Amino acid sequence: RDFRLLLDSLSSATAHPDTARRLILFFATACLVTGDRTVSAVLRLLSLIEPLNPSTYHRLFSHRRWCANRFAKLIANFVIDRFSSSDDIRMVGDETVDGHRGKKVYAKARHRDAVRSSHSHTVYRYGHKWVVLAVLVELPGVGRPLALPLLVALYRDQQTNLAEGRRHKTQAQLMCGLLARLMRWFPERKFVFAADNAYGTHQMCRFAKRHQRQLVLVSKFIADANLYKRPPRRKPGTNGRPRVKGEALLKPCEVVERRRRGKGLNVRWYGGGWRNVEVFTATGHWFKSGKGLVEVRWVMVRDRDGTHRDEYLFSTHISMSPTEIIEMYGGRWNIETTFQELREHL
């Protein structure tokens, strides 16, 4: 019944009732198709339901007028209203590469294939890179959170953007745009967003701080990050330019080396299991020349079993506990599972 309500609401995103009806039929039939998920495969099954002209459906995505942004907003409202009852909505983000080797494929480029690459060997793949923003939801009978994609953006390389006169945007900048759109749709909700080091940039930290009423960023940190205290208050009558940073603090790796022993915790880890870890944590203002300071809480995680590498994480909300930061970052593996399941499904 809820799925029918969603399909009916999608009709408001089209310019003509017939377009809405065909889209609803197409999407509903696509859920039932087995084998290749192509337009032709959907139409073969749909032809058993009602007589149709195949060219009419092929033109749905190229000639008919419908708003993808409106579709995304309707789906986001449907998912968040039903599955995210808590005050803080957990979001995860990542990118995935969809292979397309054709000569006339728009925005095709060579991208690193995260699935087949390792730390010592890089595999490249030609196709599209999609930046994906997903929400984590808990469903009855499922042993882990599900990452449901809400918004996607196509990453275009510098050559494509230059040819089209478009300003080049990095993956992090595209993700900032997706998060900004989501915050406009839900001005009264707060989002906790976790992603890997591609999105743990100083720029994204500043973005999260500007929207700190609605957004918290959790990501990987730099072991030798430059941390400082807040600059002292300027005394009246002082000459010269105001200070932009205070006294230098120890780098995270230096703090770990000096303390030697951290606090023991049992936390939820990748894959939904539990793991005994040793953590070190502190706060400081992350500095980048010309960009200013951003206050963060960093956490160093050391696996006591010795099976995982040491990880440095951070949060733009300094009141978050080390356990919350670790478990929030560990939840991002669910979007990788979503990518894997989508590839198998398609």
Tell where the protein language model's regions lie, with residue ranges.
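Short N-terminal helix-initiation segments at or just after the protein's N-terminus
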Residues: 29-40, 74, 129-139, 254-257, ...
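Single, function-defining residue in the core of a domain
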Residues: 1-13, 25-26, 46, 87, ...
